[in-house]
Amino acid sequence: MATTAQYLPRGPGGGAGGTGPLMHPDAAAAAAAAAERLHAGAAYREVQKLMHHEWLGAGAGHPVGLAHPQWLPTGGGGGGDWAGGPHLEHGKAGGGGTGRADDGGGGGGFHARLVHQGAAHAGAAWAQGGTAHHLGPAMSPSPGAGGGHQPQPLGLYAQAAYPGGGGGGLAGMLAAGGGGAGPGLHHALHEDGHEAQLEPSPPPHLGAHGHAHGHAHAGGLHAAAAHLHPGAGGGGSSVGEHSDEDAPSSDDLEQFAKQFKQRRIKLGFTQADVGLALGTLYGNVFSQTTICRFEALQLSFKNMCKLKPLLNKWLEETDSSSGSPTNLDKIAAQGRKRKKRTSIEVGVKGALESHFLKCPKPSAHEITGLADSLQLEKEVVRVWFCNRRQKEKRMTPAAGAGHPPMDDVYAPGELGPGGGSASPPSAPPPPPPAALHHHHHHTLPGSVQ
């Protein structure tokens, strides 16, 4: 285990007296010599051999023979110094219960792919420069990223996990001052497009290209949403706008209603005439109340818009036929279907009144005979009797609404000269309300009854 720790890279501390999280305490002296050999450029083959043979020979499925690798997070919160670091929080969030930064499969399979596919790339990257200089910025948390939401370690692991990353992807990520990111990093950003959008600022090792890629992905999502919902944007047009353009405005409706009322009165038509004429000409019968509410702007906007073209057509029809009085009389006759009010002479009314006193509700045969004798229409006689019965019902409750007089309750001889009761009546009326509680009073002894 001490021999294995010689070839592990140090943290940003670098020296032998540092406290790097990956350094075993028993290998402090050998770490400096291992770093110098890595700088020489020949030790990466030994590291590659170590990664292929010794890391895979570890027990319990973990590399380097440790109980748990110090640089990977644990499910229960234990482990090494880096287990709770903010740079691996993204792996904890994406890994579910195990807390490992895998790509949806098992934890052991991810480690196997990381070792087999990334061994040569990692060795080449460590051979290019100082270990502490290259590994420190890549594994350190990015300034400006909030909480523990860090997608950049996932990009590092996905570079080794996905074969499409290429040989220079990881080295380009770890190189000092590298301006661009490898294709594997773009793939990881594409897989985690939502996480890339949540970042307030691009990580330092991504550069301008990775930041532009995240913006391009977010722009693609917005473009897809705009395609699915046309008209949601500021410059889009919808069907409702076209319908609003065709509909008249409230000012137009108000002006038309005023002009229509003036024209109708000038032509000599009533509101009922207009409603019936619309039914005769266009098949839509409107009541006098509807025409009145239209002129007073009391209808809903939708109904006003529906009625306006019909009234406009009626005005045009009336104007076109204004030269010929026959057409005007025809339209007026069509509108005025209600009969005139019948005026009954005084003698005829007296005969009907005398017959009403004898029989308030005559039969159809009696109505026919009475109409023939008085030279009236049968319908006129029937309506008169109906109106007379209604008048009688209105008059009857008004006369009997008051209380009956006292003479109807008490006989004249029952009242004494002083106003008191001389003798109890044979059939006394029900007691007044004041006498209802009389039975509660007891007669005192010795009192005169």
UniProtKB/Swiss-Prot annotation:
Mind telling me which InterPro entries this protein's record contains? Answer: HD, Homeobox_CS, Homeodomain-like_sf, Lambda_DNA-bd_dom_sf, POU, POU_dom, POU_domain_TF, TF_POU_3
Whereabouts does the entry annotate DNA binding, in residue ranges? 337-396
Pfam family of this protein, just one?
Answer: Pou
Location, primary (coarse class): nucleus
Q: Which SMART domains match?
A: HOX, POU
Q: Where is this region: Disordered?
A: 1-22, 76-108, 132-152, 184-251, 393-449
Give me any GO biological process, just one: positive regulation of transcription by RNA polymerase II
Task: Return the Low complexity bias intervals.
Answer: 132-143, 218-230
Annotated function: Transcription factor that binds to the octamer motif (5'-ATTTGCAT-3'). Acts as a transcriptional activator when binding cooperatively with SOX4, SOX11, or SOX12 to gene promoters. Acts as a transcriptional repressor of myelin-specific genes.
Q: What is this protein called?
A: POU domain, class 3, transcription factor 1
**Organism of origin:** Mus musculus (Mouse)
Primary gene name: Pou3f1
